[in-house]
Amino acid sequence: MMSNVANASQRQENPYIIPLPPSSTVETSTEPPRTLWMGDLDPSFDEATIEEIWSKLDKKVIVKLIRAKKNLLIPCSSTSSSNNNTSEENAENQQSASNSTDQLDNSQMININGISFIDPSTTQLHHAGYCFVEFETQKDAKFALSLNATPLPNFYSPTTNSQTNPTFKRTFRLNWASGATLQSSIPSTPEFSLFVGDLSPTATEADLLSLFQTRFKSVKTVRVMTDPLTGSSRCFGFVRFGDEDERRRALIEMSGKWFQGRALRVAYATPRNNMMLQLQEQQQQQQQLQQQHQQLDQEDNNGPLLIKTANNLIQNNSNMLPLNALHNAPPMHLNEGGISNMRVNDSLPSNTYNTDPTNTTVFVGGLVPKTTEFQLRSLFKPFGPILNVRIPNGKNCGFVKFEKRIDAEASIQGLQGFIVGGSPIRLSWGRPSSSNAKTNSTIMGASQYMSSNGLRAPSAASSVDNSKQILEQYAEDKRRLFLHQQQQQQQQQQQDGNFSMEQMAHNNYYNYNNYDYHRNKNGSHSDLVNLQRSNVPYMQEDGALYPHQYSSPSYSLHPTGNQFSNATNNLPQFGNAMSISMQLPNGNSNKTASSMNTNPNTNMIMNSNMNMNMNVNPVPYGMGNGANMYDVSRMMTPPLNIAPNSNNSKSSIMNKHPNRNNVPPIHPSLLH
């Protein structure tokens, strides 16, 4: 306790460490603010334990613990990994059932795509990770704020039957609450929020609040998002303003601001209490834009009959999920651009598009001008098969048509408010097309489809509430899979490296393939490894390259006579760069595939029609391993001639690179 008091006295020397109460709280309350928000609570803490913590510091408090919401998925893999760093730490955490997931058996955990989560249906969650603490005086509350980032007292709690802080790694995380006391009413005033990213791992709410309060007086609250179990910072948060002009000014002034050794990244965010207004404005904008949105197919006169038949099938099959009830499922709002399970309202705005069980089209609003259809497809792809993506010219919106209704539902809930290009996107139902009514996938039960995707299949739905819970869980599972895939891609890109075009050109991949291969059988192994590491795609500031950015030269050759061999020797020798196809001129019908044997990484097939295909693996960056030669040729300028191989084709398979599947593609501009 003495160490905590000493740390507090040191912190009080700096006036910016202890922030002032929010101006809105002071103006709307007759009592001085003395209530704090307290976060990063151990999952086993209860009111009595928290009161005892403050009692150890000679402070009498009243605690209001916020209970956890049902069906909240809490990851336990992060805690497990952190607890396995040292055997001593792991042994200490065994004393607290909440600090380690090693004590959970398989029945208490859910495994989704290699990530373990606590099963809320079998494990009791005591609270949502935070509470509100009311002190006797404002002076006591300010003293408590001075304890930010200091370790919690460690003692044996009889109510939890464990130590409160055995590792001394759980620290105080405190900030002013919106209400002056626990009984004070919180006025519903407009809030204007900013997303703040690239925070230091040690930055607290009080630090961030102090930083913004010195420049903007209307700052109301600050939140730094943390891991629900370990309490470690996720290095981003949100700042709420009471004045929109100050938020606009903060966006300009605080972007790139140096804070605790890092440059801040700032963007607009949407606060929770503004979502209803946002949804109304979005609905009006959607109706205007959908007048310009052409249907992919013409209306089918048999559509209503098929819908009626689908509903009858659902009613007659207890294992089917009533899709006509899913439109009442609440949207999963990403609070202020972040990730959360908080509900904004009980249902989406009711309209004909929303209630149509055959509709699989999602309207995407709030796109930045540079967003491409490929980016939009990549964003929504983890939620299920996509039939079509369209961004109207000159409009900051788009439409994503899914194959299945439940995937569209999941994407609306899972990506609502997701930050894309620094701006949160707005999602709702778009105008349906008749092709939605022509597929049987719209009447597929949710439990059946979830199982086919490797997700944990829920029990059959028997009520609307159960349908909401199933959809929320399904959307959350897909969203976590999406974020996990993004993280894996970023880690892979970091491992591969991020070399500039000049560095790649300096590696001279052409000379290596064309000369060293014939000279020394691919050179040494170390040279090959260095080549693989250096030959990586060029990454722009806004991410990877996309198909429309490939401006490939024409590979159509028209040599005559003996010039054929020389011409083919001048083909781009960037094995594994891309797949091309060429139509041989009639005057060279006697040439064989062996005359083009210049690239050890190339497979070449010549059929009886003298159409020659040269395939190089893998395909260009951004197309994925599943793309074929036709996919690649379509995006070239001009399109290349593709001739399918016939049964009587004669082929010559050329030598393969020993590690051809591991060599990443190069930037297409080097092919010019």
From Swiss-Prot:
Residues 77-96, 645-656 have a biased composition (Low complexity). InterPro entries: Nucleotide-bd_a/b_plait_sf, RBD_domain_sf, RBM42_RBP45_47-like, RRM_dom. The modification N-acetylmethionine is found at M1. The modification Phosphoserine is found at S524. Keywords: Acetylation, Phosphoprotein, Repeat, RNA-binding. GO terms for biological process: 3'-UTR-mediated mRNA destabilization; mitochondrion organization. The keyword Glycoprotein does not apply. It holds the Pfam family RRM_1. Residues 1-40, 77-102, 640-672 are annotated as: Disordered. One of its GO terms (molecular function) is mRNA binding. One of its GO terms (cellular component) is perinuclear region of cytoplasm. Residues 36-159, 192-271, 360-432 form the RRM domain. Residues 1-13, 23-32 have a biased composition (Polar residues). The keyword Coiled coil does not apply. May be an RNA-binding protein involved in control of an RNA processing pathway that influences the regulation of cell growth in early log phase. Can bind to RNA and single-stranded DNA but not double-stranded DNA. PANTHER family: POLYADENYLATE-BINDING PROTEIN RBP47C-RELATED (PTHR47640:SF16), TRNA SELENOCYSTEINE 1-ASSOCIATED PROTEIN 1-RELATED-RELATED (PTHR47640). Present with 1540 molecules/cell in log phase SD medium. This is Negative growth regulatory protein NGR1. It comes from Saccharomyces cerevisiae (strain ATCC 204508 / S288c).
